[in-house]
Regions:
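N-terminal hydrophobic targeting/anchoring segments and the immediately downstream early-domain regions
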Residues: 2-209, 213-225, 281-291, 295-336, ...
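Active-site core of metal-dependent hydrolases
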Residues: 210-212, 217-288, 302-307
């Protein structure tokens, strides 16, 4: 009996260990999907143009997962080798800290059980992250810092205009060097404590999204239950963020939060991953009128790559959303915001971004317009508004 019990315990621990090793990759593979496709045809003109671009992306959730981004994988959307194959230069790495059970674009309760808690446990994150959203953001930030320290030839962390200038100088002789920035996916990452704004800033965060898929202490989500604007806590948080020159992202904010933030911000707003209602009537997207107000105040609108935002799953659909955005708000206000590794299905991964350049040429955009959208608008914004 004693021998049987020992064998049972051994098998139990083996099963648990196997689960903890295998499960994160299975979840990642199932969440971050690339539609099966034949290799995209890239013309000589598109290939030459793409290789000359500075490509920047405002939104990827790659730090959420257990992948070592220095290695190339056959699942998920991003890692350094694939980014380099796609000629990626600037990437905003966003940190997901809470995802409500049953998450959808229409209505989510802030009291719903949280998917990220189980993911954090399964991926063996520090125990402090199991109960603190701030610790989850800080842990993911530390992952990016560790990558920059371990692989300085391929990644440089950017926190200021001076560091951005240094990065651009280094990239002239090291064209595969990636410039990484940090942002939050919702300011519930503050854990309801304004002091955490400084903690996150000190750890390198330079963009903060106000909401995600549910209402939080700052105000209503576009996909929440209240539809409310900024609360007093939200106004206080925005004031402190602006004082630290943190860039504000309203991607998932209620329309009233966007209106309130526009009224009080002295810095143009970002919509880091989105589509346009006039192009794709989805509850994921705010109204075209608000998009025009954001752009009129100097803001940037970054177009995503997934069906829920652009009503299609092809490079041509991404290009169509971009063309619509240019017609709506102007070529100086459109950028890329893939939402790579954000539990979405896309038509390409980070190695295939030349397919977007090809699609934009096919849509008759000029090379100047393509340069702006693919990264120069992002660069200009960062050069202007980073601390």
């Amino acid at each position: 009996m004693k021998k049987f019990f020992s064998l049972f315990i051994g098998f139990l621990f083996f099963g648990i260990a196997t689960f903890l090793i295998v499960a994160p990759a299975i979840v990642d593979d199932g969440a971050n999907v690339v539609v099966a496709h034949q290799p995209y045809e890239i013309s000589e003109r598109a290939a030459a143009l793409h290789s000359s671009l500075l490509v920047g992306d405002w939104h990827a959730d790659s730090l959420l997962w257990m992948r070592d981004l220095t290695e190339q994988y056959d699942y998920g959307h991003l890692d350094f080798p694939r980014m380099q194959q796609g000629n990626m230069a600037l990437q905003m790495f966003t940190t997901v800290t809470k995802s409500p059970s049953g998450q959808n674009y229409k209505r989510n309760s802030s009291d719903a059980s949280d998917n990220i808690t189980l993911l954090a446990m399964t991926q063996r994150w520090p125990v402090a992250t199991w109960t603190s959203l701030a610790e989850r953001a800080l842990f993911q930030a530390d992952k990016l810092h560790e990558l920059a320290d371990r692989d300085p030839e391929n990644l440089m962390l950017i926190r200021s205009r001076d560091e951005l200038a240094d990065y651009l100088q280094r990239r002239q002789s090291s064209p595969k060097l990636i410039g990484g920035l940090l942002g939050t996916e919702g300011s519930h990452a503050l854990d309801g404590d304004l002091n955490n704004i400084q903690r996150l800033f000190d750890r390198g965060f330079r963009m903060m999204s106000l909401q995600h898929f549910f209402d939080n202490k700052l105000g209503g989500s576009l996909h929440g239950t209240s539809g409310e604007g900024l609360t007093q806590f939200g106004r206080d948080a925005v004031t402190q963020m602006l004082a630290l020159e943190i860039m504000l992202d309203v991607s998932h904010s209620s329309e009233q939060v966007v209106i309130d933030t526009l009224a009080m911000s002295n810095k143009p707003l970002l919509v880091s991953h989105t589509g346009f209602q006039g192009h794709c009537q989805s509850p994921r997207n705010i109204s075209d009128g608000l998009m025009q107000q954001i752009a009129a105040a100097g803001g940037l609108i970054a177009v995503g790559y997934w069906e829920g935002a652009i009503c299609g799953n092809s490079p041509a659909t991404v290009a169509a959303a971009i063309v619509y955005g240019i017609e709506l708000v102007g070529e100086d206000h459109i950028a890329l915001g893939s939402d790579f590794d954000g539990s979405v299905t896309t038509s390409l991964d980070g190695s295939e971004l030349a397919a977007i350049t090809q699609a934009l040429l096919d849509a008759n955009l000029s090379e100047q317009q393509i340069r702006k959208v693919m990264g120069e608008n992002m660069l200009t914004y960062l050069q202007t508004y980073l601390p």
